[in-house]
Amino acid sequence: MKHESIVVVYDSCQAIAEEIADKLGAEAVSVQSINNRQIENSQSFVLAVEFQSAGQLTPHWLYAYLNFHAVSLKGKKIAVFVTLGNKHDDDCVAKEFCEKLKENGAHIVGELQYAGTPEWNLDNWVCAISPNL
């Protein structure tokens, strides 16, 4: 059974997003298809954010970022992990991304995580965020 109010948003990391969605009983949605109505109608999000070199969001995520700022996020819970990017190079930008979501009313759930780093453990991260989504 899918938890309709949780949406896992991904770009090129569909397999990881679907695994997280399965663990949460949520829906996985491509960043290319997320729209303002879905953002307004959902209560919680897991964002699988991607960065290009020099700490820039990928074009699809940049567009989604604008969508997430076009509507109020008040009361919405958002967990963020970086699937493409370098923790050393992108950490400040990723933290700023989270801060901007908070400025728009979102509550950031859990710690910002980077897939593929030594401390990354998908199961542990999902267990940590799931009670708060």
Feature map (PLM): residue ranges:
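FMN-binding flavodoxin-like domain, especially the glycine-rich phosphate-binding loop
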Residues: K2-V29, I39-L133
